[in-house]
Amino acid sequence: TETEMMRYIKRLDRKDISLAHSMIPLGSCTMKLNAAAEMLPLSRPEFMCMHPLVPEDQAEGYRMLIENLSEELKTITGFAGVSLQPNSGAAGEYTGLRVIRSYLESIGQGHRNKILIPASAHGTNPASAIKAGFVTVTCACDGQGNVDMEDLRAKAEENKEDLAALMITYPSTHGIFETEIVEICNIIHACGAQVYMDGANMNAQVGLTNPGFIGADVCHLNLHKTFASPHGGGGPGVGPICVAEHLVPFLPGHGLFGNPMNEVSSAPYGSAGILPITYGYICMMSTEGLTMATKAAILNANYLAACLKDTYGIVYRGANGFVGHEMILECRKIHEETGISENDIAKRLMDYGYHAPTLSFPVHGTLMIEPTESESLWELDNFITVMQTIWKEIQEVKNGEADKDDNVLVNAPHPEYEVVGDNWEHCYTREKAAYPIESVRENKFWINVARVDNTLGDRKLLSTRYGTF
């Protein structure tokens, strides 16, 4: 019955933490608010009942929205052309590289097959480059997390004749603004190659700078990050690419329009159903609002960094002592001194009602945190309180006040069925496990399962088919 279906969906909802409960601090994911007003078009049949291959004269309004959104994205990125076809950020990377290849072939440079990728670039870059048929060359970073300029110059010169492009993320995945970004672009262009800017961290650029101004040739955007469409359980993503004037002729076409060059989606405008959300976000925010959002995102990240630097420590800071829109929290020393790992800290955060941050990426043994502009001062302060309380729990282990093999960290998370069960054999109280601070008492989110073996779970998928709801 519909009633059963409704209750089934609600049961699933209760198992899943979301922004409706607390901040999701996943670094490099930009888990910002998906405002209800932006989502309104999803309930309108004029948008949702439109077939991707509908005749053009029956989709004039939708085409107008697509054209207007494309103009907005060109203005934001400082580029001359846009394709909305790619269905994810990684698909955008792949598409951008295909565009670069087509351009190079058009000027008799099709032999160029190497992509230079700094160690601080976004994680999908090497895979996208290889998928697009290129060979990757890694460029080192210095001790401050910046691209090592000497190594960059050496690698660029060494591969000068075969270099197709540099893929670089700005701000970098280390959470800092590369001070030499313009010079980096100049070095690559001097080799006859193109600059691909990964837009994963565009939330720290909008309104303050843009890839075109910096000197890039192509970038992709993540509408599900910077531009507020939902991540939605791993999708749906939209990863449009924006390109400089000389690359516009090589943007993806579509067989429907008689030009399948660089086509990457079966639908001419990709996941077009998502576009009204982003269009609504941009129109409601306006230029001033988008710029303020960028400033607030950077401010929030630096506020967290300032409050956590004396306990955990921040791995990388920019030349001015600040981070970008995210930070990497140092946990390696904690593990050396106490045996408590970044994994233990991440799982303990679940007991406090928070989604775990990004774990051991891009630096092993660390946590990457991105608060976005959407979080209030109260939420930031509560998260700081939680992290400092966990720090105290770590110190209890370090000082011998808590058993190193049986404590709230190594046993986290603590689901309800475990806390209320008849047998409780831990050295600490049920209250310490489940209700460590007052804010948790007021807004408890119960995790569904106790600790699982991450590696075993990743390597051995066990699927279950349910006969009924």
Q: Which role fits each region the language model picked out?
A:
Residues 1-81, 98, 118, 149, ...:
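Non-catalytic terminal extensions of PLP-dependent enzymes
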Residues 83, 137-139, 357:
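General small-molecule cofactor/ligand-binding pocket signal
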Residues 86, 141, 168-171, 329-331, ...:
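Short glycine-centered, acidic/aromatic-flanked micro-motifs in structured strand/loop junctions
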